[in-house]
């Protein structure tokens, strides 16, 4: 099928030769494309929107032919949630609770612990009525019920949210898994100790509790001092070790106590050098080794993960580590807990657990459980996950019977026994718990039944829809000569899209202002047979129904008229263009027309026609209940001129109107055209402003122009006179300075630097600005009339507010400008002393009270600022840490020179370099006096004024800070600006290091406009740690506020 635009042109091609009053019904059907051939199936890749008869590519492909029943299923098979035979049950990850799930699976597979928990007295569960849901309350009740579900539930995985909620854990915050294990076992032991059953009271100690002693031996007298202690796991340092044996050996090694760490011996009654070691005395049935992978890094101030490979045996002989014990003490590996990830603040926890009955190994990964092939533990896949491009370490070879891991953080060993005892025997679920499990299983089966019924309903519904589509789709095409109707294309697509609900047919969107089918909407509608329309409307309802009588003659006539007008416009445009090229005859009367209007008149005429059409559409939208979209021509927004140079015209010939509504005095913006040209243009713009050749320009504009030229001439004369009289001041040559007082005068005059800068601007551009008429020296005085600056302060920072004048210059200024207050500084020689001591006196005198207040205000602003700017300069080496850029010479304070690009430092480029404008700030003198913004300047000994405005350098960025924010907050800002982690930042200011992260910037002496040097440490080998910087910056609260701490 031809493209949409070609169909559009073909539908209206007849309008060029047919007058509006000669339109027939055949022309109307051509405009609505009734006779356009329908597309055959397979001929179109997508539906032809320009063809109302094209019914291909609207979603029918999926319904024609045979359809598999599975395609009708919009609900997952509930049996996929069912537990397979001889498999274990998983646990749902509630967000970041994978660390909880791993320990629950390990403790569930401890048969003695599970058997003991089943004996826990639970009167609420024993007396529970199965008509209502059981809700455990205590931790033991939750764990007991959870273990029963893990053992006999029909579900593939269960939800541990009851236990997690009872513990008060934050499901979105990953916590320290090792700390959770300790706290939970401690809480469980405390709860079970209150039971009457002695076996239940001591089950945690029997399973997990061992004993060792800290033995201290005095080097002088040899006295041993044992200090017994219990343990539930052995925390082993892995740094610098390769296998578990080395870690245990280091744990038990002897430690020397000397120097300040000497031991007080009760026998010697004094501090003596001594040795201390840990002596294992008894080991539990379940021996837990906590491998200390997550350690505190003193350099960064945060935790980090040690990705050290540690090998460990399947069978562990602990006899060599027990003193005075000859019986066998052999343990067999029963669980390995894994942390996937390279960071201590993120990652994923899984558990490898050995089944006590079959000795098969299983991997527990939240809801997913995978049985290992064979009888051996397989960790290879888990070790590959943590590898990164920067941290690949070759895995060491393991001997037979050993395993190696860089991610294992806990090893669980079970004591071997020679005979088969109750540990290997099945653990039966008590009757009262089994009843609760069966209640949950019934609920699960009911859910599965409901889901199956819903799946069957969706299949039945899909089959019915399939038959309906096959029946109706064949009836949709309207044959030639048959009655037909129009329905929305989008509705047909939704009818054929099984995923969306089908609404009633809505044809109101297609209505024109005459209540019929708008010809512009034909691309959004499809022509179907009357029989198909009757069936669709009877089943789905809706309206209004649009048939052959709904074709709008009025709209077609209006469009025909517009098309003919556009064609006539093109002919007139060519004629006007040719006539405008001819020169106007001397005896011929002409008309003034704007050059922009002459360039754009065709587009303006087209816009008027389109506005009429858009107005019709706008009214049509109101009838259909639609809103006109902003930015359309109906809203008065016109497009760019295709004939002009892009200028936007509101009305024709208004570009030669002045502000007063008369003929503009700008002759370059208008030209004369002949009466023939003007008459043709006036046909399209009857209301356009008309000016004949002899029409006078606006008198008010001419008077203002004369006055402006006179004022401009006066300003130029004034500027030349002032410049010649004060040439050195303008060029900043031969300027007096306070550092080296001129020898030929004892008095200098003072004016605000702001006055000098504004005066220079006028001298440079006298025609663009207003002349400076007065010298506002009162701005340098306090409310009492006293001067605000001392001689010493004007040598330093206060030089940014003043300019010094020679007496001759002051005499000129006092004549040319109005001066509100004379300010001078005198040099006074002390003749009473032989050393020629010199004093300096200002007039008016210094107001000491206001001066002290001003200094106090400055100091307070330095300490209590908000939203101030500081500059962070990233440096590469130590030389650049202390290097400061030389001040840049400024021969004048013009705006042009302020905009010049600043010179860059040579040396190594930094990718974080950016250049932005610097600026000086207004400084307040007190509550009523303020100094205007000016370029900060100092005066050198040579008399050349140099700018001290901040110059941004390579590798420097401006940050907005407040005095009360901490150094840590600043480091986070720097992290965002430079992509340098806070723990890799070394900050200094004026050679002084900034170290205390908790200190405020005000207390550290960081003031507005400070330059802070950033020296970044070498990037860490593990780039993925940057992803956890945000978590690092959050305060670590652990399990504060949870049930694990008794809250």
UniProtKB/Swiss-Prot annotation:
Catalytic residues, chain numbering: 98 (nucleophile), 348 (proton acceptor)
Reactions the enzyme catalyzes: Thiol-dependent hydrolysis of ester, thioester, amide, peptide and isopeptide bonds formed by the C-terminal Gly of ubiquitin (a 76-residue protein attached to proteins as an intracellular targeting signal)
GO cellular component: cytosol; nucleus
Transport keyword on record: no
Domain Ubiquitin-like: 961-1012
Ranges where the USP domain occurs: 89-416
UniProt keyword terms in alphabetical order: Cytoplasm, Hydrolase, Nucleus, Protease, Repeat, Thiol protease, Ubl conjugation pathway
Phenotype when the gene is knocked out: At 5 dpf, knockdown results in significantly reduced auditory startle response to white noise at 600 and 800 Hz. Mutants have less developed vestibuloacoustic neurons innervating the ear bases, less organized and fewer statoacoustic neurons, show a significant delay in the development of primary motor neurons and are smaller than the wild-type counterpart.
Region named Disordered: 609-647, 887-928
InterPro entries tied to this protein: DUSP-like_sf, Papain-like_cys_pep_sf, Pept_C19_DUSP, Peptidase_C19, Peptidase_C19_UCH, Ubiquitin-like_dom, Ubiquitin-like_domsf, Ubl_USP48
Pfam families linked to this entry: DUSP, UCH
Function according to Swiss-Prot or TrEMBL: Recognizes and hydrolyzes the peptide bond at the C-terminal Gly of ubiquitin. Involved in the processing of poly-ubiquitin precursors as well as that of ubiquitinated proteins.
Protein name: Ubiquitin carboxyl-terminal hydrolase 48
Native source species: Danio rerio
């Amino acid at each position: 099928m031809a493209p949409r635009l070609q169909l559009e042109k073909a539908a209206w091609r007849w309008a060029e030769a047919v007058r509006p009053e000669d339109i027939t019904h055949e022309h109307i059907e051509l405009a609505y494309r009734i006779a356009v051939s329908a597309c055959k199936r397979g001929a179109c890749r997508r539906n032809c929107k320009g063809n109302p008869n094209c019914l291909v590519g609207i979603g029918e492909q999926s319904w024609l032919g045979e359809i598999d029943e599975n395609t009708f299923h919009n609900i997952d098979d509930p049996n996929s949630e069912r537990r397979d035979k001889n498999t274990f049950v998983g646990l749902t990850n509630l967000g970041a609770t994978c660390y909880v799930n791993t320990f629950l699976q390990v403790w569930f597979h401890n048969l003695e612990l599970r058997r003991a928990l089943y004996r826990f007295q639970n009167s609420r569960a024993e007396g529970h009525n199965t008509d209502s849901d059981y809700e455990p309350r205590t931790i033991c009740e939750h764990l007991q019920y959870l273990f029963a579900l893990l053992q006999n539930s029909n579900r593939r995985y269960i939800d541990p949210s009851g236990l997690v909620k009872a513990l008060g854990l934050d499901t979105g915050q990953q916590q320290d898994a090792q700390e959770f294990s300790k706290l939970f076992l401690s809480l469980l032991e405390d709860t079970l100790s209150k039971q009457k059953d002695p076996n239940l009271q001591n089950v945690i100690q029997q399973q997990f509790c061992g004993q060792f002693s800290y033995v201290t031996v005095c080097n002088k007298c040899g006295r041993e001092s044992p200090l017994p202690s219990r343990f539930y796991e052995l925390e082993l340092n892995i740094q610098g070790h390769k296998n578990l044996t080395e870690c245990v050996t280091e744990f038990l090694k002897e430690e020397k106590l000397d120097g300040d760490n000497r031991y007080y011996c009760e026998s010697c009654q004094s501090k003596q050098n001594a040795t201390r070691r840990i002596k294992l005395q008894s080991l539990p049935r379940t021996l837990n080794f906590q491998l200390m992978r997550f350690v505190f890094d003193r350099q960064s101030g945060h935790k980090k993960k040690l990705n050290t490979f540690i090998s460990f045996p399947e069978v562990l002989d602990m006899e060599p580590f027990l003193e005075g014990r000859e019986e066998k003490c052999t343990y067999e590996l029963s669980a390995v807990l894994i942390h996937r990830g390279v960071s201590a603040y993120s990652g994923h926890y899984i558990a490898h657990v050995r089944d006590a009955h079959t000795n098969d190994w299983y991997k527990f990964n939240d809801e997913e459980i995978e049985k290992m092939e064979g009888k051996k533990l397989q960790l290879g896949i888990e070790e590959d996950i943590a590898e990164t491009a920067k941290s690949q370490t070759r895995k060491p070879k393991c001997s037979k019977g050993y395993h190696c891991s860089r991610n294992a953080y806990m090893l669980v060993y079970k004591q071997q026994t020679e005979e088969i005892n109750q540990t290997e025997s099945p653990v039966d679920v008590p009757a009262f718990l089994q009843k609760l499990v069966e209640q949950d299983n019934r609920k699960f089966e009911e859910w599965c039944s409901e889901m199956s019924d819903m799946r069957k309903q969706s299949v039945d519904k899909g089959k019915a829809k399939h038959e309906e589509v096959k029946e109706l789709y064949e009836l949709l095409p309207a044959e030639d000569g048959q009655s037909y109707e129009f329905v929305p294309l989008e509705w047909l697509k939704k009818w054929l899209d099984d995923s969306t609900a089908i609404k009633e047919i809505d044809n109101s969107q297609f209505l024109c202002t005459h209540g019929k089918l708008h010809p512009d909407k034909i691309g959004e509608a499809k022509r179907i047979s009357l029989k198909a329309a009757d069936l669709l409307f009877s089943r789905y309802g809706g309206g209004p129904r649009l048939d052959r009588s709904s074709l709008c003659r009025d709209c077609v006539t209006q469009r025909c008229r517009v098309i003919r007008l556009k064609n006539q416009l093109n002919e007139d445009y060519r004629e006007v263009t040719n006539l405008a090229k001819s020169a106007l005859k001397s005896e011929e009367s002409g008309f003034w027309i704007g050059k922009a209007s002459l360039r754009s008149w065709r587009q303006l005429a087209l816009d008027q026609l389109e506005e009429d059409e858009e107005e019709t559409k706008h009214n049509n939208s109101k009838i259909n209940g639609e809103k006109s979209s902003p930015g359309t021509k109906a809203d008065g927004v016109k497009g760019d001129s295709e004939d002009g140079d892009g200028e936007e015209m509101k009305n024709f010939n208004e570009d030669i109107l002045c502000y007063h509504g008369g003929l503009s005095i700008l002759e370059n913006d208008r030209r004369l055209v002949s009466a023939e040209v003007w008459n043709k243009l006036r046909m399209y713009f009857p209301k356009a402003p008309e000016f004949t050749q002899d029409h006078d320009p606006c008198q008010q504009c001419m008077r203002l122009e004369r006055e402006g030229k006179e004022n401009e001439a006066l300003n130029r004369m004034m500027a030349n006179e002032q410049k010649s009289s004060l040439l050195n001041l303008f060029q900043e040559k031969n300027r007096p300075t306070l550092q080296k007082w001129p020898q030929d005068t004892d008095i200098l005059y003072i004016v605000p630097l702001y006055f000098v800068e504004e005066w220079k601007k006028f001298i440079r551009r006298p025609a663009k600005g207003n002349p400076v008429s007065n010298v506002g020296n009162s701005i340098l005085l306090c409310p009492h009339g006293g001067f605000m600056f001392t001689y010493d302060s004007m040598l330093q920072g206060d030089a940014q507010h003043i300019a010094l004048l020679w007496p001759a210059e002051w005499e000129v200024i006092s004549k040319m400008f109005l001066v509100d207050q004379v300010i001078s500084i005198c040099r006074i020689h002390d003749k009473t002393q032989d050393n020629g001591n010199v004093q300096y006196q200002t007039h008016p005198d210094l107001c000491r009270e206001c001066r002290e207040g001003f200094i106090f205000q400055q100091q307070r602003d330095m300490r209590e600022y908000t939203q101030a700017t500081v500059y962070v300069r990233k440096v590469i080496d130590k030389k650049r840490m202390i290097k400061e850029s030389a001040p840049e010479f400024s021969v004048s304070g013009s705006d042009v020179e302020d905009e010049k690009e600043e010179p860059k430092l040579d040396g190594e480029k930094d990718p974080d370099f950016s250049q932005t404008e610097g600026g000086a700030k207004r400084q307040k003198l007190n509550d009523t006096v303020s100094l205007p913004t000016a370029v900060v300047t100092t005066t050198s000994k040579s008399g050349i004024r140099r700018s001290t405005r901040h110059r941004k350098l390579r590798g420097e960025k401006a940050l907005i800070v407040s005095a009360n924010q901490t150094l840590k907050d600043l480091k986070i800002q720097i992290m965002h600006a430079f992509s340098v982690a806070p723990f890799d930042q070394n900050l200094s200011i004026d050679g002084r290091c900034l170290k205390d992260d908790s200190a405020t910037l005000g207390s550290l002496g960081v003031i507005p406009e400070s330059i802070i040097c950033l020296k970044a440490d070498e990037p860490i080998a593990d780039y993925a740690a940057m992803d956890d910087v945000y978590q690092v910056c959050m305060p670590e609260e652990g399990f504060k506020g949870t049930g694990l701490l008794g809250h």
